[in-house]
Amino acid sequence: MMLRIVLLVAAAATTMAAQSTGRQTRAEMTNYEETSTYADVMFVIDDLVKSSPLVHAESFGKTEEGRELPLIAISDPKVTTPEAARRLGRPIVFVQANIHAGEVEGKEAILMLARRLVSGDLKPMTKQMVFLIAPNYNADGNEKITPMNRTAQNGPVAGVGTRENSKGLDLNRDYMKLDTAEARSLVGFMNKWDPHVLVDLHTTNGSYHGYHLTYSPILNPNADPRLIEFTKSKMLTPIRQAMLKSHNWRVYDYGNFSPEDGGGRENSRVDPANPGNTTWRTFDHRPRFGNNYAGLRNRIAILSEAYSYLDFKGRVAVTADFVEEIYKSVQANAKQIMTLTAQADRALTAPAASRPVELGVDFSISSSVDKVDILVGDVTKVPNPRSGRDMLAMTPSAVPVPMKEYVTFAATRSLTLPKGWLIPKTLAESPRLAAALDRLRWHGIKVQEFASDQQLAVERFTIAELTKAPRPFQGHQEARLKGTFDRVQLTVDAGSLFIPGNQPLARLAFYLIEAESDDGLVTWNVIDDGLAVGQTYPIYRVVDARAITVKSQ
């Protein structure tokens, strides 16, 4: 795999030699009129590898069109394997960019930060952390650069790539269903390297607010609450203060303006003198989104959204500064981050009797008790000479307006995390569940096989309601089940499958497997084929796992 990367880098370097100005990105070389192509990214990576003994480059998978997905590892001493990284006993921090290839400043910013880690002012950090960087996740979409994509975005004027991958799918909706080669590659990377902190770089448009960048921690309440609280209070709040004090950037919790009774409908423009019942509202709790998915893996996650109407150079700069402040926060809190993530894993692998964990299946967004000041901004039109269309540029206006904010979620109905889940042998061998088992294993979830026939107390789910979305989304008609549980004794045949509830990824397993999950195997039509009202859901909740004997792995 490394040979393929080297060959691709060599080809990119050959084609770029005439335009090269050392390790600069395409954005820097063109005064921020253009963004980097795949070849440009590979050229910069090649230069980093050649210029420093601290840099390792490899591929963590392939795109749908067969492009290698580059990964950079920077550390002193150099690490080339996950095992070597873990032996250092340091936080492993992963930053990915360009999941939406029209949102390109993260790709440029993280390559510039990589230079500083290798030979600049950030180099001392390489003795304290392991830095992992995936600068061009949606590599296929990145090759479809045109000025006619995201035309209202304030640069680069030469254009950007597409939001979707080559299959027309949004990679930031694919973390659970894993329909794309890219998402399967990324989850495989997470299983392999298991970073403590994950950062996802985006651009946001939407409402005309007064922030240069907005961010989000984990929004799903089923993540370990200690990780959520730590990210908010010990990382993001000090980072917000540092961004203003040290860099003069205004940053805040991600949101858009929405009327109090608007059902989540967004308003682009708000009149500061007459805001009415406007609120500030975040996006979504579901783990189809990367920051929420990482939370279910017991890891810290931060979403970064540079403001689309800030000019391209400014977006690159604010993103770079934000990631730098995240790095500094991890550096300052290294011991606590490693302790908290390890505790989150251990809390799920402790003896069953000591770990009752309640996890949500229904959720609602929560309002702040009091109104808070949210910065209301505005935009003006500026012409793009390449597209012939107007871009929108943020104005200096940033008026604080008191309003309620909705930036957290809470579970409204929960179930106890079971001792595990049972798939009877007759069902486990059916084509119907093959895709479900594939996905569980792709996610890194442990699946075991019963060694002998056994009697087992289980909870059986009977379907009372099955609803499907009227319109397809991401190639699926999202499904939802409602029903009731009853407790029964089953004779379980040898060869039946058991998914333990006492494994580090149990929160993720719960979200994928549970019949009433709002973003699981049922949601994405992996397991709903043939289900009907009155039928039994084919996966059972195990009540008592003490007597279970499984085959050794």
What label would you give each PLM region?
Residues 9-18:
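Hydrophobic h-region of N-terminal signal peptides that target proteins for export
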